[in-house]
From Swiss-Prot:
Official protein name in the record: Bifunctional protein HldE
Pfam families reported for this sequence: CTP_transf_like, PfkB
Gene3D superfamilies given in the database record: 3.40.1190.20, HUPs
Gene for this chain: hldE
Chain residue ranges for the region called Cytidylyltransferase: 344-476
Subunit structure: Homodimer.
Function: Catalyzes the ADP transfer from ATP to D-glycero-beta-D-manno-heptose 1-phosphate, yielding ADP-D-glycero-beta-D-manno-heptose.
Length: 476
């Protein structure tokens, strides 16, 4: 499966869970301490990153989604750092500040790419009033299409059953990264994402893929779950749902430097993709690709839609296919950053014929990437009149995406693609027919940005209208 990136700008996700601050101290190590047999690190720089549930929120924001987060913090300097950092990324924070507790903070000392020690500053949040979190959840639910409960067993999800019930009552799917060996509190969740160690701690040793599926189905039935996604390290991940075939996904990681936060990335991409309208199997494929990216980074990491697109589609010779506008803009920027020339054209392409294919092949030869923008059904009807289009938008785009000359296919609903072109800003805008370059929609914007506009001739004797008339007349 090669999934297509959704438009994450349409995804609203609420994250509730254990928030923490990850601190990193970096420096070289050149000697052993005379006080004890430990290395001496000369700290030269430091870094602070949101961790735990806050890293989940940061992942969603980095994809372009709308993240809201609820969690428990102290009233201290780490809480301030967390809030300011997340706000700068456009994450809406609604933390419960409890002065009697410290904000959970983890300090890692790093040298030469290796973690030497981790120091944890925390007290488990216990006995907090559940209404503090529930009321914040109620405020957020009307604005989201998915809920993530990120459980690190630090106390924020002490009343997880009530959170699941409230989300289900609002008909919002609940995705949970579980903790511990007791899954009873997660009863009724839409999906759990245990890693293999967490899964085996609950069901016992797994001996084969079939055994994993059988045990996963047992958990699904026992705890009334919608599905289980078991992340399996070098073996990828497996999605198990009742009454459906298991969906095995091989790992996409080329190199593994650090698994810190990989589970956060999986659940964030998964939930954001579902919130943006993707079916669960495609969302899992996207999450698997995302995990392959972040384990190749050091420390708690996020990824962009550009990195995710490249992980999915691989080399420049691989067609991207149908793509959402926001993802296309990111993909074009990535292509241009690598020195690739991006060509763009547009049309209705109602009944694809030899003239279209010849035109698109010629357009593709003018650069490294070809974008085809396609009028939606409503747009075609306004331009061509009643009875058009013959083929709906999704079919027209699917046919175009299957052509070797075409890299991306994107729909637009306006009468002209001027707005879309001004957002994408290709290096070369191409149009077929007898237009003057200055009259082509979007041409002025492309030229102003340093690009070019070119007119190509259509092949004589090929016309969609003629084909339709011939069919109506009973010929051919």
């Amino acid at each position: 499966m090669k999934p297509i990136l959704p438009d994450y700008n349409n995804a609203g996700v609420l994250i509730i869970g254990d928030v923490m601050l990850d601190r990193y101290w970096y420096g070289p190590t050149s000697r052993i301490s005379p006080e004890a047999p430990v290395p001496v690190v000369k700290v030269e720089n430091n870094e602070e990153r949101p961790g735990g549930a806050a890293n989940v929120a940061m992942n969603i924001a980095s994809l372009g989604g709308h993240a809201r987060i609820v969690g428990l913090t102290g009233m201290d300097e780490p809480a301030k750092v967390l809030t300011e950092t997340l706000n700068s990324l456009k994450v809406k924070c609604d933390f419960v500040a409890l002065p009697e507790y410290p904000t959970i903070t983890k300090l890692r000392v790093m040298s030469r790419g290796q973690q030497l020690i981790r120091l944890d500053f925390e007290d488990k949040f216990e006995g907090t009033d559940p209404e503090l979190v529930l009321t914040r959840m109620e405020r957020a639910l009307p604005h989201v299409q998915a809920v993530i409960l990120s459980d690190y067993a630090k106390g924020a999800l002490e009343h997880v059953e009530a959170l699941i019930a409230k989300a289900r009552a609002a008909n919002v799917p609940v995705f949970i990264d579980p903790k511990g060996t007791n899954f009873e509190p997660y009863r009724g969740a839409t999906l759990l994402t245990p890693n293999m160690s967490e899964f085996e701690a609950v069901v016992g040793k797994v001996t084969s893929d079939d055994d994993l599926v059988e045990k996963a189905l047992g958990l699904i039935e026992k705890f009334e779950l919608g599905a289980l996604l078991v992340t399996r390290s070098e073996h990828g991940m497996t999605l198990v749902r009742p009454d459906q075939k298991p969906f095995h996904l091989p790992t996409q990681a080329k190199e593994v430097y650090d698994v810190t936060g990989a589970g956060d990335t999986v659940i964030s991409v998964l939930a954001a993709s579902v919130a943006a309208g993707k079916p669960l199997d495609e969302a899992c494929a996207l999450a698997n690709a995302a995990a392959g990216v972040v384990v190749g980074k050091l420390g708690t990491s996020t990824l962009s839609t550009i990195e995710l697109a490249e992980a999915i589609h691989g080399s420049r010779d691989t067609d991207f296919g149908v793509i959402a506008e926001a993802a296309l803009i990111d993909a074009v920027k990535a292509a241009q950053a690598k020195g690739e020339k991006v060509v763009m054209t547009n049309g209705c392409f109602d009944i694809l014929h030899a003239g279209h294919v010849s035109y698109l092949n010629n357009a593709a030869k003018l650069g490294d990437r070809l974008i085809v923008a396609v009028n939606t059904d409503e747009s075609v009807k306004r331009l061509k009149g009643p009875g058009r289009p013959v083929n709906p938008t999704d079919r027209r785009m699917a046919v175009l995406a299957g052509l070797g000359a075409v890299d991306w296919v994107v729909p637009f609903s306006e009468d002209t693609p001027q707005r879309l072109i001004s957002e994408v800003l290709p290096d070369l805008l191409v149009k077929g027919g007898d237009y003057k370059p200055e009259d082509i929609a979007g041409g002025k914007e492309v030229i102003a940005a340093g690009g070019e506009v070119k007119v190509l001739n259509f092949e004589d004797g090929c016309s969609t209208t003629e084909i339709i008339d011939a069919i109506k007349g009973g010929r051919g």
